[in-house]
Amino acid sequence: MIFYFTGTGNSLWVAKALSEALGEPLVSIADELHKEKDGWVYPVRPDEKILFVYPVHSWGPAMSVTHFISRLTLNGYTGQSVYSISTCGDECGYTDRLIGKALEKRAISLTAAYSVIMPNNYILLPGFDVDDKDVEERKLQDAPARVAEIIEAIREHGQDALYHTGSMPGLKSYWIYPLFAHLAIGSNSFRVTDACISCGLCGR
């Protein structure tokens, strides 16, 4: 089973490639979150591989993913292989450790973490911008080979080897990421007036 979260399509492309190669069904985390359940329960087979595919946001996992995991139950989980595949513009920091900790709280053990470098697409903070066209094209050309390596590693029950931590991961993932999560993608910028019609758009 492949749980995936995607914003611009990078992680969806990776998830589809993994699904086709490994024969595991896709589950959209965004779609599941919109169902507003008290929790998310899924049966897993004894031989099932469980994958989480998602983007790195400021050197940490997309918050929708950790929110989903915080209320996730895998019925029949007895230690099956669980993999994290994150897409990033350049480096992931300790995203693997953060996702592993989130899973551990649900009594799920992370087997291995992998990463795929894809075009940068975050532009809302100073110093962030999309890649130059040649860099973007190079990343897109390199991505299929990287995904193929990850598929082979999963088939061979490989451990962490195809993951790019980058420089100063502690600073980026344990200091910058929490600030980003609180200030950049929180609800502080929203306000409600009498014009609100409760359409729910602001919560999507």
Question: At which residue positions do the language-model features occur?
Answer:
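Local sequence-structure signature of Cys/Sec-based thiol-disulfide redox active-site neighborhoods
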Residues: 1-4, 192
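FMN-binding flavodoxin-like domain, especially the glycine-rich phosphate-binding loop
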Residues: 2, 8-13, 17-33, 41-54, ...
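Short, charged alpha-helical interaction segments and adjacent helix-coil junctions
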Residues: 185-188
